Swiss-Prot record:
Protein name: L-threonine 3-dehydrogenase
Cofactor annotation: Zn(2+)
Organism classification: Bacteria, Pseudomonadati, Pseudomonadota, Alphaproteobacteria, Hyphomicrobiales
Chain residues that bind NAD(+): I179, D199, R204, L266, G267, I268, I290, Y291
Chief location of this protein within or outside the cell: cytoplasm
Active site feature: T44 (charge relay system), H47 (charge relay system)
Amino acid sequence: MSNMMKALVKAKAEPGIWMEEVPVPEIGPNDVLIKIRKTAICGTDVHIYNWDQWAQKTVPVPMVTGHEFVGTVADFGAAVTEYKVGQRVSGEGHIVCGHCRNCRAGRGHLCRNTLGVGVNRPGAFGEYLAIPQHNVVPIPDDVPDEIAAIFDPLGNAVHTALSFDLVGEDVLVTGAGPIGIMGALVAQCVGARKVVITDINPVRLALAKKLGVQHVVDASKEKLRDVMPVLGMTEGFDVGLEMSGAAPAFRDMIDTMNNGGKIAILGIAPTGFEIDWNKVIFKMLHLKGIYGREMFETWYKMIALVQGPLDVSGLITHRIGIDDFQEGFDAMRSGSSGKVVMDW
């Protein structure tokens, strides 16, 4: 094996991403070296491509980006005993410290010292990736590569959707991006009564409808208050999944929640915004922030879901070779694509 590989690198502190030759990652005794088969482009990768304020203060340059992947074990350190060369794997993109209070209590997703693959340390947009063995997740034979490549965002959706009991509940999802659509489909799979998704992007709403989300609402043309009676809803939504990061959507959600409703918040807002906290108080709402995936319960649950009733393959709208990476980033930056999967 050559000690050099091709990789997509954030090589300059300016918009863009570049294909370069970089050294193959070195592994320590507890690391696994993964030969990448497929990767997917995340919204985080778009932020890094655009070099927005968040990226400028977060990502050191140069950096191999990317954190949505599937591949096979190519090598491993002397202390690794659970994996074998050629085994299909994906992996958790949040590297946690293992020694803080939350890590020691089994709550690794709450680690204060988390490092992000492809953000704070070299990522998956390369021919090889090195991660700690603790972060490696074996992929069952009946899960296709392209589905395993999008487990990171699917995990975000599963973590958000399963934060509260959904059986028999009316669920509002604000934001029909890929993760929002995934969250709506998960809610339907686990027994929600009514599932409504809102957005103002007609392409994304059309994709949500095509994939089988029960009720699709264009918030620029319809008011939720007008839609609810048509669905037989008399009191409000029981559970909200906020996936948009958009102030108007979050305010609509608060307005239409039932008293005692529960909201899981994954969408990241570009800037701070106000909400009416009196409504939160007098409705006695429960708000829960979501970041990443629970380690590793979310992984177990989403693998079980895709082995069963959950089909998210229709969310992949672009399948391209890695040499056409610019086409993939252009599609993601347009805001009108589903998931983009790149073949290495």
